[in-house]
Swiss-Prot record:
PANTHER family, per database record: METHIONYL-TRNA FORMYLTRANSFERASE, METHIONYL-TRNA FORMYLTRANSFERASE, MITOCHONDRIAL
Domain of life: Bacteria
Top enzyme category: transferase
Keyword terms: Protein biosynthesis, Transferase
Official protein name in the record: Methionyl-tRNA formyltransferase
Annotated signal sequence range: none
Coiled coil regions, renumbered to chain: none
NCBIfam families: fmt
GO molecular function, one term: methionyl-tRNA formyltransferase activity
Biological source species: Parabacteroides distasonis (strain ATCC 8503 / DSM 20701 / CIP 104284 / JCM 5825 / NCTC 11152)
């Protein structure tokens, strides 16, 4: 079968999923429909509906779009069957019921932003950086009953530099993933379906690191950690949702502070953990047990994000605070 004859239904929602869809469209593959989330209410009183990034791209190139509220809704399933897909591709969408992923004759494959079986879950890029990994990657795998556990089709590896954050890794994986999606389609067109069970990639489930969804409490900095761990934590949450702490004044006043960029400065010292040290012009150092975290870009609650010089110009009393 030629790629022009293979009927593909694509499922995805955020920016990360746009690149793979674009690669399929521009590569001449036959995308017959796109499934994405319903438009999201925005603005005051939810009066404005914001379409997903995938919908915006799909509409711009004239692709049919379906936006089901419920994936088991019979009206949606009838519309999906009418597309007569040979293959479904999922990139950053949602968990599919079997009635959906088992519909096409070639099955449904997913692009996941980790080297499965590591980092199964909703936030694989964040957790790889938070944990200080020096490598991550992308995986295509067939969907099955349990989330992120299906047979692996192909993987590509990406080094993580010590200066990378979630944004840089996300963008690199987005481009790499788009290439892997088209490569995977080509393999399936050639009849090469030698997918490998994930159990062959590890000996003990205890070796596996999860990638659970990140909540606000997840992002709170623990200043009792080593400086490298805190540094990795900051870059693993930057720019979104951002690591945060509280500035605590001598009288107990607390101000929420997001930290977007920092430097790790290992050193021996006798300062209390959480104490703040600054020249009031160009740097803020927070003492931790094995050094200092030098803050580079931050944001007080209710204020805009600032570099350290601008922040110090407007916050002269910073040294009177500690962090916690």
């Amino acid at each position: 079968m030629k790629k022009e004859d293979l009927r593909i239904v694509y499922m995805g929602t955020p920016d990360f999923a746009v690149e793979s869809l674009r690669a399929l469209v521009e590569g001449g593959y036959n995308v017959v429909g796109v499934i994405t989330m319903p438009d999201k209410p925005m603005g005051r009183h939810g009066s404005v509906l914001q379409p997903s990034a995938v919908k915006q791209y799909a509409v711009s190139v004239g692709l049919p779009v379906l936006q089901p509220e419920k994936l088991k809704d019979e009206a949606f399933l009838e519309e999906l069957r009418a597309l007569r897909a040979d293959l479904q591709i999922v990139v950053a969408f949602r968990m599919l019921p079997e009635v959906v992923w088992n519909m096409p004759r070639l099955g449904t494959f997913n692009l996941h932003a980790s080297l499965l079986p590591q980092y199964r879950g909703a936030a694989p890029i964040n957790w790889a950086v938070i944990n200080g990994d020096t490598e991550t990657g992308v995986t295509t795998f067939f969907l099955t009953h349990e989330i992120d556990t299906g047979k692996i089709i192909r993987q590509r590896h990406l080094p993580i530099a010590d200066t990378d954050d979630v944004e840089t890794v996300h963008d690199a994986l987005m481009a790499m993933g788009a290439r892997l999606v088209t490569e995977t389609v080509d393999l399936l067109l050639d009849g090469k379906t030698d997918a490998i069970p994930q159990e062959e990639f590890y000996k003990d489930a205890a070796e596996l690191r999860p990638a659970p969804k990140i909540f606000k409490d997840t992002c709170h900095i623990d200043w009792n950690q080593p400086v490298k761990n805190i540094y990795d934590f900051v870059r693993g949450l930057s720019p979104y949702p951002a690591a945060w702490t509280e500035l605590i004044s001598e009288d107990g006043k607390r101000l929420a502070l997001k930290i977007y960029q920092a430097e790790k400065r290992p050193a021996e010292h006798n300062f209390p953990v959480g104490s703040i040290h600054t020249d009031h012009k160009s740097y803020i150092d927070v003492a931790v047990k094995d050094g200092f975290l030098r803050l580079r870009s931050l944001q007080l609650a209710g204020k805009k994000r600032m570099n350290i010089t601008d922040f110090l110009n407007g916050f002269k009393q910073i040294a009177e605070y500690t962090v916690g």
